[in-house]
């Protein structure tokens, strides 16, 4: 049985959200191969990343009944300037809110923001196997682009990493990507 769908408020993430975000992500670090980190993170790491990236990349949280229930955010795909129009996307939903559509809702808001900003494409990196994540990404329009075999070792096993990409239609040459605050 799926958990009950509750209305979610999707908004920009703030520094005050990062302890809750850290708790959500640490669950996946400790219990799964969704995240290839092997040690839990501290809230300050999340705060530092948010402050460093939020002007250029959207960071969104979903609040349900006053609690942070998930996060979707983007960051740079690679550090070279030619990649400026490609972002990497990530989404995490608290275990209590899985299978409620919240991940797709968060991702839809994130993708609308990235497209409005002028990004050309978005890459998702998925630790495999992870059928629910693959299904969600493909339902949102991502297409598989490749795989690295046995790229990460976690929980006593080697795991593949898959790459999915969503392309937006943009002119050539592209215009500069807009800051998050200008969309």
UniProtKB/Swiss-Prot annotation:
Q: What Gene3D superfamilies does the record point to?
A: 3.40.630.30
Keyword hit for Acyltransferase: yes
What positions does the entry give for acetyl-CoA binding?
91-93, 99-104, 130
Annotated N-acetyltransferase domain ranges read 8-173
Q: What does this protein do?
A: Inactivates phosphinothricin (PPT) by transfer of an acetyl group from acetyl CoA. Can also acetylate demethylphosphinothricin but not PTT or glutamate. This enzyme is an effector of phosphinothricin tripeptide (PTT or bialaphos) resistance.
TM ranges are none
Question: Which InterPro entries does this one have?
Answer: Acyl_CoA_acyltransferase (IPR016181), GNAT_dom (IPR000182)
Q: Which organism is it from?
A: Streptomyces hygroscopicus
Instruction: Provide one Gene Ontology biological process annotation.
Output: response to herbicide
Which stretch is the leader sequence? none
Q: Which family does it belong to?
A: Belongs to the acetyltransferase family. PAT/BAR subfamily.
Protein name (Swiss-Prot/TrEMBL): Phosphinothricin N-acetyltransferase
**Matches recorded under PROSITE patterns:** GNAT
Question: Which top EC class is named for this enzyme in its record?
Answer: transferase
What does the record give as EC number?
2.3.1.183
């Amino acid at each position: 049985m799926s958990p009950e769908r509750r209305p979610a408020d999707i908004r920009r993430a703030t520094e005050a959200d990062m302890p809750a975000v850290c708790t959500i992500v640490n669950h996946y670090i400790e219990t799964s191969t969704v995240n290839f980190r092997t040690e839990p993170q501290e809230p300050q790491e999340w705060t530092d990343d948010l402050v460093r990236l939020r002007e250029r990349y959207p960071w969104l949280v979903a609040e349900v009944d006053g609690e942070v229930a998930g996060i979707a955010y983007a960051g740079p795909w690679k550090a070279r300037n030619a990649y400026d129009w490609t972002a990497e996307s990530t989404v995490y939903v608290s275990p209590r809110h899985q299978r409620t559509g919240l991940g797709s809702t968060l991702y839809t808001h994130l993708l609308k923001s990235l497209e409005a900003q002028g990004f050309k494409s978005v890459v998702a990196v998925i630790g495999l196997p992870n059928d629910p994540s693959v299904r969600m990404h493909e339902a949102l329009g991502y297409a598989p682009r490749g795989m690295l075999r046995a790229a990460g070792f976690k929980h006593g096993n080697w795991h593949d990493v898959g790459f999915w990409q969503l392309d937006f239609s943009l002119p050539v040459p592209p215009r500069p990507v807009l800051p998050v605050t200008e969309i």
